[in-house]
Structure formats: C-alpha cells, structure tokens
C-alpha cells in the first residue's frame, strides 16, 4: 500500500516546484535537501533554488520559446516563475532575478507551508518502494545517490562540464568607458557594455589561450566534455579568432551615443567596437554585475589578471570568481515515461536538469509535471501528460520514451535540450514568416493549456487548493 505522503529529494528549482504543487493539492510532502550538511562545488549557500550559473530565465516575449515556457508555468501558478517575477531585475527583454532574494523567498515560502516538512540530510539511497518519490537532485547529484540510480536503472549516467561566470562589484567599474545599453535598444538599457578595439581583443584572446586553468579533480584522467550551450570563455577563444565575437562578445546592435551619429555610415564603421563584453545586473540597484557568457575554469588569480584587461574593468573587484563543475543527467528516453515516471517503478518520478532539460524554466516545468502527477498518484488517480502542442509537453516528450527520434536512432547520444519551437508539432496551416509562425505556436499552446487545465482541475477534489 502506498504511503500518501510524497518525498521530494532536492530543493533546487524542480524540487521546489514539485513540492509546491504537491502541497497545494492537499498532499503532505517531505522535502529533502542535503545542503548545508553536504554542499557541492558550485553552491555557495544553503538556500533553496540557488542559481549557480546565470541569473537569467531567458527571453520574456511569448513568441520566443523561453518566454512561452515561462507563460505556461504562470498558467499553473508556478512558484518558481511567480518568485522570479517578484524579484526580477532589469535585463532588457529577458527575465533575470536578484538571485539572493529569489532563493531566500523560495526557502521561506516552502518552510512556512503547513503541508511541507523540510529535512536537511544527504539522501544516500532511493526511498522505500511504497513511498511516492520525486528525484529532483539536479546536475550536481551526490556521487552516492548517483551510484544508487545507476544500480537501479542499469545505465551509466551521462555528464558534461558546466561553469559559472564571475560577478563584479559595480562600484569598481570605470563608467567613463563602460556604457549602458540593450542590444538594438530593446527594453531598458539594462546591460553594461565594455567595448574593445581589435588590439584589445586579440591580446585578450591570447591571454585566455595561454592562461593556467584550475584542476578538475574528478576528471583529471578524462577528456573535457563541454555543453555546447555553455562553453567556457577560454574554450571559445581556443576554437577560433572570431568565435567569441560571434558569441557573447558580439558588438552588433550596441552603440554608445558618445560615439556620434549611429546612422552616419562612415562614422559607424569608424567607431564601432571590434567586440563588446556585457555585464548584467545581479540585483535591482546594480551593485553586483554578472559577466555575461564568461563561464570559465581559469584559476582565480588568472581570472583577476585577464578579466582586468577588459577596458572598463581595469580595477574590477570580484564578488565571485567563475568555477567549473560536473553536471550529471540521466539517459531519460530509455528510462522515463512522458509523465516523468520511471518505466521500472511507477511511483518514482524524476524532474529537472537531471532528466536532461536545459534552463531554469525547463527545470521548473519538470518539477511542475512531476509534482502534479505525484499528487494524482497519491490520490489514486492516473498521472497525466501535457498536450504535445505546449512547450512543457514538447520538452517532456523529448526527454521521455515518447521521443521517437531517440527510439529510431539508438546510436544518437542524448544531450540536454532547452525550450525550442523545433520540438512542438507543425501547424496545420504552414506559416513561412518565422515571427508569425512563432506567434501561432504561442497562441495554440496557451489555448490547449487552458482546456487542459480545466480537465486537470476536475481531477482534484474541490477542497484542494491546486493552482
């Protein structure tokens, strides 16, 4: 007989969302978090939902895949997105947050929920078979639990190298050189921009290539397996002279009014920087700034020396240096149903980045689905899948055994996937214009989710407080 209380292992974004959805359905939940008893190479606090990499959830606009995913989460009263909205900071057209206030709020909200019991210890094994459990331990799952999952699934977990960017004290930046602007003047001038001429850029690139890197003690005997969407800046420098310029250091769409008339072609060609380093606010007042796209595994002394070569950052003081760590994820298409239940055990769910979704909103969406389905199972009801036309449904299909591409091409190596319109079904009436097509995807998704939510709500008792 199943114990009605649900166990959620891991209080990251997916775990917090799962616990919230379960508790708000009227089911008791035990939320297990190993920090601060046992920390990780990337975490700095014991707060829930700590953002160890960027502080950005991606584009806000619903005609962008990331923005649509955020809006879908709002439809289901997502704790993660609601909290991100509450503690957002200016970031042009993106949703970025004050990471400290964000994680503290998550911790307080769940700690104060009457149906949530917080337990601080390292989970070393899978809970008993009669316990409904959500595994949301994230990409930094402890070695002990990762080995237990390996034994349970019969498969080795996958991994890649991930890294975090440095954070700088805003007051130590030279604002005579750095200027505020957003690319193409979209939204508020939320980014601080440090322009580089060609000589600056080439010297900077050479320094990155020759710099001494920190040792990854767990991987000294392994070749680097980087996640292409989050490459270390020194790896980009090694890949080619202009790789950084076509990535995080691209200057297109950024202009300082001090340089004169943007629409004077001769002036524009003369004054346009060879490259630009961008910094994004970490807090509302801009006291702390994150170096956008500057994930790195350089030694801290090298980071300080080389990043001070950037014009405007000559006297920069660092709140936090960049670090690299191992990210673990499951080969989910061989293990999970689209409901996020394990094929081998129907009362065991997985959610978040450990399943192979990429991005904060995607992690929350996994927590949302796993939490809803754990609640249904606790009430002796059948788990659900999100509509294929929704971004949540498309992502869950991709990471589950419903992923037809994976089933047909067994040799393909499963890699993490962010929200993408390439995952959703084609429209009945094809639209050539990309912007109009994306808007049509958005309209279709929100319409089907509205109907889906009505059906889902009816699955829960009226006295429950789900969504």
Curated annotation (Swiss-Prot):
Its GO biological process annotations read: tRNA methylation; tRNA wobble uridine modification
Kindly state which reaction or reactions the protein catalyses.
uridine(54) in tRNA + (6R)-5,10-methylene-5,6,7,8-tetrahydrofolate + NADH + H(+) = 5-methyluridine(54) in tRNA + (6S)-5,6,7,8-tetrahydrofolate + NAD(+); uridine(54) in tRNA + (6R)-5,10-methylene-5,6,7,8-tetrahydrofolate + NADPH + H(+) = 5-methyluridine(54) in tRNA + (6S)-5,6,7,8-tetrahydrofolate + NADP(+)
The protein's matches in Gene3D superfamilies, at most eight in alphabetical order, are given as:
FAD/NAD(P)-binding domain
What InterPro entries has UniProt attached to this entry? FAD/NAD-bd_sf (IPR036188), MnmG-rel (IPR002218), MnmG-rel_CS (IPR020595), MnmG_N (IPR040131), TrmFO (IPR004417)
Residues reported to bind FAD: 10-15
SUPFAM superfamilies per UniProt: FAD/NAD(P)-binding domain
Span-the-membrane segments of this chain are none
**Cofactor field:** FAD
In its UniProt record, a GO molecular function of this protein is: flavin adenine dinucleotide binding
Task: Indicate the family of this protein.
Answer: Belongs to the MnmG family. TrmFO subfamily.
* Role description: Catalyzes the folate-dependent formation of 5-methyl-uridine at position 54 (M-5-U54) in all tRNAs.
Q: What is this protein called?
A: Methylenetetrahydrofolate--tRNA-(uracil-5-)-methyltransferase TrmFO
Look up and give the organism this protein is from: Prochlorococcus marinus (strain MIT 9515)
């Amino acid at each position: 007989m199943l114990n009605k209380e649900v166990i959620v292992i891991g209080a990251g974004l997916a775990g917090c969302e799962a616990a919230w959805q379960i508790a708000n359905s009227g089911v008791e939940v035990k939320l297990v978090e190993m920090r601060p008893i046992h920390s990780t190479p990337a975490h700095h606090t014991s707060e829930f939902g700590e953002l160890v990499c960027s502080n950005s959830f991606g584009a806000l606009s619903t005609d962008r895949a990331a923005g649509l995913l955020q809006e879908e989460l709002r439809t289901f009263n997502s704790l993660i997105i609601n909290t991100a909205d509450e503690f957002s900071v200016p970031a042009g057209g993106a949703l970025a947050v004050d990471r400290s206030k964000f994680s503290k709020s998550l911790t307080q909200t769940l700690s104060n929920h009457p149906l949530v019991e917080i337990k601080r210890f390292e989970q070393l094994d899978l809970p008993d078979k009669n316990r409904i459990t959500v595994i949301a331990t994230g990409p930094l799952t402890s070695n002990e639990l990762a080995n237990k999952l390996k034994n349970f699934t019969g498969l080795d977990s996958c991994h890649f190298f991930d890294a975090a960017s440095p954070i700088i004290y805003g007051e130590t930046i030279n604002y005579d050189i750095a200027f505020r602007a957003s690319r193409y003047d979209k939204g508020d001038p939320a980014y601080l921009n440090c322009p580089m001429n060609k000589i600056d850029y080439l010297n900077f690139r050479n320094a990155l290539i020759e710099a001494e890197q920190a040792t990854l003690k767990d991987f000294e005997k392994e070749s680097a397996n980087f996640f292409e969407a989050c490459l270390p800046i020194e790896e980009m420098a090694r890949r080619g002279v202009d790789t950084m310029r076509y990535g995080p250091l691209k200057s297109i769409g950024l202009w300082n009014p001090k340089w004169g008339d943007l629409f004077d072609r001769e002036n524009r060609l003369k004054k346009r920087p060879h490259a630009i380093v961008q910094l994004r606010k970490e807090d509302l007042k801009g006291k702390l700034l994150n170096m956008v796209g500057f994930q790195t595994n350089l030694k801290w002394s090298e980071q300080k020396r080389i990043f001070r070569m950037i014009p405007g950052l000559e006297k920069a003081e660092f709140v936090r240096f960049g670090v690299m760590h191992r990210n673990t994820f499951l080969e989910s298409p061989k293990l999970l149903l689209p409901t996020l239940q394990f094929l081998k055990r129907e009362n065991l769910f997985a959610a978040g980045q450990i399943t192979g979704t990429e991005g904060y909103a995607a992690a929350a969406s996994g927590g949302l689905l796993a939490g809803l389905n754990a609640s249904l199972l606790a009430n002796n009801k059948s788990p659900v899948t999100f509509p294929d036309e929704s971004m949540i449904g498309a992502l869950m299909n991709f990471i589950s055994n419903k992923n037809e591409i994976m089933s047909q091409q067994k040799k393909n190596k499963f890699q993490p996937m962010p929200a993408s319109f390439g995952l959703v079904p084609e429209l009945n009436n094809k639209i050539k214009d990309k912007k109009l097509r994306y808007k049509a995807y958005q309209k279709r998704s929100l319409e089907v989710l509205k109907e889906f939510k009505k059906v889902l709500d009816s699955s829960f008792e009226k006295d429950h407080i789900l969504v």
